[in-house]
Amino acid sequence: MIVQCLLAVRGLHRVGGSRILFRMTLGREEMSPLQAMSSYMAAGRNVLRWDLSPEQIKTRTEELISQTKQVYDAIGMRDIKEVTYENCLQALADIEVKYIVERTMLDFPQHVSSDKEVRAASTEADKRLSRFDIEMSMRQDIFLRIVHLKETCDLEKIKPEARRYLEKSVKMGKRNGLHLPEQVQNEIKAMKKRMSELCIDFNKNLNEDDTFLVFSKAELGALPDDFINSLEKTDGDKYKITLKYPHYFPVMKKCCVPETRRKMEMAFNTRCKEENTVILQQLLPLRAEVARLLGYSTHADFVLEMNTAKSTRHVTAFLDDLSQKLKPLGEAEREFILNLKKKECKERGFEYDGKINAWDLHYYMTQTEELKYSVDQETLKEYFPIEVVTEGLLNIYQELLGLSFEQVTDAHVWNKSVTLYTVKDKATGEVLGQFYLDLYPREGKYNHAACFGLQPGCLLPDGSRMMSVAALVVNFSQPLAGRPSLLRHDEVRTYFHEFGHVMHQICAQTDFARFSGTNVETDFVEVPSQMLENWVWDADSLRRLSKHYRHGSPITDDLLEKLVASRLVNTGLLTLRQIVLSKVDQSLHTNTALDAASEYAKYCTEILGVAATPGTNMPATFGHLAGGYDGQYYGYLWSEVFSMDMFYSCFKKEGIMNPEVGMKYRNLILKPGGSLDGMDMLQNFLTREPNQKAFLMSRGLPAP
């Protein structure tokens, strides 16, 4: 998942809050109110600070609002006939960079700080700044000057990226309703402010959730000793199991006690149920009403207009077609799982209920992998200590993309476990950016896996380039005494995926902050990172990523062959579940009268063939709904069509570590950032229109 500092200028929500904003900022002549910010705006520097106290966060938030508002006010009073490219468009870009960087220091700590008071202050700053963003985004005086500039300037005389910036600015202004009557604008503004707060609260609730369950050792049957020994014990000699990924998934995949899995699945899918259900009941109608006032049939239609899919009709057709193609495969996989369950219930003396329950799915899919391919993930993870995986991952990316990474000593970070690296072009030595690695869970930390864009890589007023900065935030298991953190293969894949987002953020070289890094269409943003997941299914790459944590021996060829062969295991059910989530997301954003829990239950039964557990409400735990993927979750599958096409037609054909193909990918897919449309970048790379052939093959389906 990608969480960008620049989602604001795309008019999307982001994890932790919404920045629904067309940032109409101002020019060089009026920069004096922001001189206090200018001291840290320097080329080739990471200017971010992570030591702000709650009081400083609050003070700097108000200062940022005051200073920025003065700039907006000044441009709003400018005689419209005096508006030029230099004093308006270029000036917008200059101020935008400063605002983004300062804002990042104020709102990012809510996701990663170890201090609860800092997280709370950061969350409040995000809410306060989001309200301010909306106010500024809906200033008609600024919008009219942008429109005037577009109508009067010679577009052919400005650079293509500047022309795109101008056209997108006008488009975003209209998508904010600035062409509508004042009364309608005020309605939209009020609703957007409320939506922003709801999104922030939705994900804050999930991040702060500290639910845990208590089990005896017998109730954790079949779980490995190293996992059980890592758990905190209660006074009654039982074990605490949290709902964080490093606890939840091992239990769901390996615990042989159905009742334990049932309790865990029930708790996991009722996290924040009461409060987040209420939030969704408020948020979804607000989105629909804003879309209606802007002239769209539904919120999904509103957001899809800016994506490569363009319409709900195209998305529905894509999901329904894929669902039908996968139906036979899903049925076969369910039948196999049901037979496994029947056999195990007989052997262990459990009651066999004749169906696959939600808490059975991960467990029996793991057994399927072990039986069909002899892949034991517990044995396998001993070859993936996190230090070895990290070193191998960094080496592969450096070699593939022509980069060099250097760890920064004594780096300024938000937690002692976080590391910082500088990225340089290997050929020229030019510094491109920096990235943080925040790998382990902490109380209150963002509880999924994501790349956060923190500092945009773009041009500064003096023509020099600001380096891009990103953070990879994941939650792998903590190291134990005498044993490093060991990763499951699916965690290695997650690591590669999210680091692909980091490379997109770092390698993009754009003029404008608005187009920097991963600031592309939402249904294209996953393409680069998904494409790079293929490396964790390549035997040679896996050798570079692995070494036994105790004796340092390489992973055996036999184990490698089995792992690579297992790529297609459970692919039908896994893809059908993605379709379920995509359909739920589309449904909730096309018909607000629907009940989220009921809609999820309906599609689980109809498409996945595994009923949702009564009493749960998975959508209330679905952070994507409030994190920038509203109406756009389909993008994960949609993007895979493109990513698989790129991999099989170029990398697989020419060699996955071929440096020429790697540089072509870096230059044609990563470097443009959002300065080109996603489909144009794809066609430049493929030299043809993309097709579904490779994607269908990757799912074990016949290609047309």
From Swiss-Prot:
Matches recorded under SUPFAM superfamilies: Metalloproteases ('zincins'), catalytic domain (SSF55486)
Superkingdom of this protein's organism: Eukaryota
Catalytic activity entry: Preferential cleavage in neurotensin: 10-Pro-|-Tyr-11
GO biological process, one term: peptide metabolic process
Gene3D superfamilies: Collagenase (Catalytic Domain) (3.40.390.10), Endopeptidase. Chain P, domain 1 (1.20.1050.40), Neurolysin, domain 3 (1.10.1370.10)
Binding site for Zn(2+): H497, H501, H504
Cofactor annotation remark: Binds 1 zinc ion per subunit.
Pfam family, one: Peptidase_M3
A Gene Ontology cellular-component term: cytosol
Transit peptide: 1-37
Cofactor(s) annotated in UniProt: Zn(2+)
Protein function: Hydrolyzes oligopeptides such as neurotensin, bradykinin and dynorphin A. Acts as a regulator of cannabinoid signaling pathway by mediating degradation of hemopressin, an antagonist peptide of the cannabinoid receptor CNR1.
Family as reported in the entry's similarity comment: Belongs to the peptidase M3 family.
Name of the protein this chain belongs to: Neurolysin, mitochondrial
Taxon lineage: Eukaryota, Metazoa, Chordata, Craniata, Vertebrata
Chain's gene name: NLN
